[in-house]
């Protein structure tokens, strides 16, 4: 009997403690809600200044273990406020330290709150609710820690709608998000299996297996830097006169800052490009940017954002201001000796792979106190080194030319007969200006510039002679490469 009494007493004490703690965290949530809404509205104004939307809280009802609240997104534009249209979300909040919804899932880690949110069937969303047969098209479950960090899982319901000539098929999607309390660290993961939009007369667009991941951190200058990745397994566009299939499209980026200088690497790839069933090949692009002054970039971005509306209304005046801004910030931008490289950009088909590499090293303009040169001269002075290398196997170029001819209506035999002539014609035209070389079945090109001297495929000349060669429609040559002495 004593043991039973002790057990009941312990349960009662724990229950009272849980109730008290839940009531207290509910009170904390209510206090922080206004701050959360104010911060959200500030973010909306900062990142979407022309959207004219505002978030508010309505019908907050606080209980001991749970609370309910209605978040409403209003449109501030009177012309858009028709019949009181608004987007609203109904949120159920389970109070910590052990939110009931988390306990039922055997998650016993303490948290301030657990939230379940669904969209409300308002006039603005009625059409969308009709497609989901009255269910909320988007739901979310969120966990908030005591320091304010947020973890959310957002589910988008599948859609299957057909009306007249149109058809929409969507498999649904899932988004997971981890956001720090100060909004500086954000990790996102988005996945969807299938999206198809079809029109009986216009064709269709199909997306298969889309994955998007992002892990970024906000810097003191408000740059969101980190890693991002996008992959689309298949993208198909079908129309009356086209059938394009892109397979294995990827895009990845990695950005960081060091000593107020920005660095980034951007990789793009396509596993296969097929048009009307013809496999045109695969390609990739790898781009690197290093040592870019963050403050100079921010000044340009801030000005551009502020003048975005003027850019549409007063294009010429704003363009002049942009040019002045670039000229003013160029010395700072070049102070870190920024670099840009492409290594490589390539395209590969069944007959070979063409590659292009590019390197640009920039330098500080003039010593302090020197009279600034005009913008065009500054651009020339800013280039410390510029290099480019091109390699195209003739067989690969011929195959590509034949495929393009077939896409334009030529038969296979006609395309294969025309392709070598087309390639040789283009090569001959480029060789007139010494832009390419042709040796051992390879079309190549090499360009190097430094110290006002250009070397193009072994021919050395001044920058002025190089530019004048194109302006005067004459071959670009000034000095032939040195020949080794011959022994007799």
Residue ranges and their predicted role:
Residues 1-5:
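Positively charged n-region of N-terminal signal peptides that target proteins for export
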Residues 8-9, 16-488:
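Glycine-rich, small/hydroxylated-residue low-complexity segments
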């Amino acid at each position: 009997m004593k043991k039973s009494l002790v057990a009941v007493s312990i349960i009662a004490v724990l229950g009272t403690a849980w109730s008290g703690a839940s009531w207290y965290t509910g009170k904390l949530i209510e206090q922080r809600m206004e701050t959360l809404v104010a911060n959200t509205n500030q973010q909306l104004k900062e990142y979407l200044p022309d959207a004219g939307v505002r978030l508010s809280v309505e019908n907050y009802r606080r209980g001991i273990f749970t609370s309910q609240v209605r978040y409403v997104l209003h449109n501030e534009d009177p012309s858009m406020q028709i019949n009181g249209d608004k987007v609203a979300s109904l949120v159920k909040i389970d109070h910590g330290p052990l939110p009931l919804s988390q306990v039922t899932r055997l998650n016993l880690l303490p948290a301030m709150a657990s939230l379940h949110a669904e969209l409300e069937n308002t006039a603005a969303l009625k059409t969308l609710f009709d497609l989901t047969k009255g269910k909320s098209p988007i739901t979310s479950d969120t966990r908030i820690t005591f320091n304010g960090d947020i973890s959310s899982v957002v589910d988008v319901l599948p859609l299957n709608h057909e009306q007249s000539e149109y058809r929409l098929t969507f498999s649904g999607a899932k988004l997971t998000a981890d956001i720090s309390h100060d909004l500086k660290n954000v990790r996102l993961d988005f996945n969807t299996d299938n999206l198809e939009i079809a029109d009986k007369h216009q064709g269709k667009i199909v997306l298969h297996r889309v994955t998007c991941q992002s892990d970024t951190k906000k810097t003191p200058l408000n740059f969101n830097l980190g890693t991002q990745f996008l992959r689309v397994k298949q993208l198909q566009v079908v129309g009356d006169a086209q059938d394009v299939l892109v397979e294995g499209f990827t895009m990845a980026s990695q950005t960081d800052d060091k000593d107020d200088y920005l660095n980034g690497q951007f990789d793009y790839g396509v596993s296969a490009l097929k048009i009307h069933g013809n496999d045109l090949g695969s390609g990739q692009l790898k781009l690197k940017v290093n040592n870019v002054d963050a403050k100079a970039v921010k000044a340009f971005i801030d000005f551009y954002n502020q003048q975005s509306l003027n850019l549409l209304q007063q294009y010429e005046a704003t363009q002049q201001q942009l040019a002045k801004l670039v000229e003013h910030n160029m010395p700072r931008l070049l102070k870190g000796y920024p670099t840009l490289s492409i290594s490589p950009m390539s395209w590969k088909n069944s007959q070979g792979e063409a590659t292009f590499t590019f390197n640009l090293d920039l330098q500080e303009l003039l010593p302090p106190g020197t009279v600034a040169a005009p913008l065009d001269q500054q651009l020339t002075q800013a280039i410390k080194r510029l290099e480019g290398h091109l390699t195209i196997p003739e067989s690969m170029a011929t195959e590509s030319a034949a495929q393009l001819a077939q896409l334009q209506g030529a038969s296979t035999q006609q395309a294969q007969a025309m392709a070598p002539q087309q390639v040789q014609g283009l090569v001959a035209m480029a060789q007139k200006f010494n832009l390419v070389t042709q040796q051992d079945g390879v079309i190549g090109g090499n360009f190097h510039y430094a110290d006002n001297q250009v070397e193009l495929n072994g021919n050395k000349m001044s920058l002025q002679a190089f530019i004048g060669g194109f302006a005067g429609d004459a071959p670009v040559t000034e000095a032939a490469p040195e020949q080794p002495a011959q022994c007799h």
